[in-house]
Amino acid sequence: MITDYEWPLWQTTALVCGIDEAGRGPLAGPVVAAAVIFPRWFRPVGTILERVNDSKKLSAAERELLAPAIRNAAAFWAVAEVDPETIDQINILQATMLAMNQAVAALPIQPELLLVDGNRFRTELPIPYETVVKGDSKVFSIAAASVLAKTHRDELMVAYASEYPQYGFERHVGYPTRAHVEAIRQHGRCPIHRQSFRLRQLGEKP
């Protein structure tokens, strides 16, 4: 992927920021968002960053290779987490919006334009934004943000696996796999599980 989407925007706007999240669907762990600003007129042609894509289309090894390259090439980047307790309090959609806003606020400079994956966004900041459906497959900056968010969250979940080894977080990173649901059936939920995410497989009602 290259920066074709950003180039027309860079004609008038220097600080274009891509935003994406990871972790809306899991039963455990935080939702994570990343915000990435590349230098104006940046082109990844001829570099490893040509391989940047929607994090879901990349293998774990590819993401781990690309993440440090993205951080090195970016002018600015930031990552933010919203914990399971907050997700339970305000719901996953609101928690995702909060994480995205926190990631932007954590940047050392205020962007001039936000490019957000998806079809909805609610900003707490006085910054113009565009939502881009399937933006992580179309917009380089958003795809890069998706890789940073995903790798950051996966690292957190692998760390949690040593604290709660009975759940196998290092394998499914909190997603509702059959093995994860069975572990919850056997051991109940642990402190990083989202209590508001109910499981029909266990006879739980919404």
UniProtKB/Swiss-Prot annotation:
<comment type="function">
    <text>Endonuclease that specifically degrades the RNA of RNA-DNA hybrids.</text>
</comment>
<feature type="domain" description="RNase H type-2">
    <location>
        <begin position="14"/>
        <end position="206"/>
    </location>
</feature>
<keyword id="KW-0540">Nuclease</keyword>
<feature type="binding site">
    <location>
        <position position="21"/>
    </location>
    <ligand>
        <name>a divalent metal cation</name>
    </ligand>
</feature>
<dbReference type="GO" id="GO:0030145">
    <property type="term" value="F:manganese ion binding"/>
</dbReference>
<comment type="similarity">
    <text>Belongs to the RNase HII family.</text>
</comment>
<dbReference type="InterPro" id="IPR036397">
    <property type="entry name" value="RNaseH_sf"/>
</dbReference>
<protein>
    <recommendedName>
        <fullName>Ribonuclease HII</fullName>
        <ecNumber>3.1.26.4</ecNumber>
    </recommendedName>
</protein>
<dbReference type="InterPro" id="IPR022898">
    <property type="entry name" value="RNase_HII"/>
</dbReference>
<dbReference type="InterPro" id="IPR024567">
    <property type="entry name" value="RNase_HII/HIII_dom"/>
</dbReference>
<dbReference type="InterPro" id="IPR001352">
    <property type="entry name" value="RNase_HII/HIII"/>
</dbReference>
<keyword id="KW-0963">Cytoplasm</keyword>
<dbReference type="GO" id="GO:0006298">
    <property type="term" value="P:mismatch repair"/>
</dbReference>
<feature type="binding site">
    <location>
        <position position="117"/>
    </location>
    <ligand>
        <name>a divalent metal cation</name>
    </ligand>
</feature>
<dbReference type="GO" id="GO:0043137">
    <property type="term" value="P:DNA replication, removal of RNA primer"/>
</dbReference>
<dbReference type="GO" id="GO:0032299">
    <property type="term" value="C:ribonuclease H2 complex"/>
</dbReference>
<feature type="binding site">
    <location>
        <position position="20"/>
    </location>
    <ligand>
        <name>a divalent metal cation</name>
    </ligand>
</feature>
<keyword id="KW-0464">Manganese</keyword>
<dbReference type="InterPro" id="IPR012337">
    <property type="entry name" value="RNaseH-like_sf"/>
</dbReference>
<keyword id="KW-0255">Endonuclease</keyword>
<keyword id="KW-0378">Hydrolase</keyword>
<dbReference type="GO" id="GO:0004523">
    <property type="term" value="F:RNA-DNA hybrid ribonuclease activity"/>
</dbReference>
<dbReference type="Pfam" id="PF01351">
    <property type="entry name" value="RNase_HII"/>
</dbReference>
<dbReference type="GO" id="GO:0005737">
    <property type="term" value="C:cytoplasm"/>
</dbReference>
<dbReference type="GO" id="GO:0003723">
    <property type="term" value="F:RNA binding"/>
</dbReference>
<keyword id="KW-0479">Metal-binding</keyword>
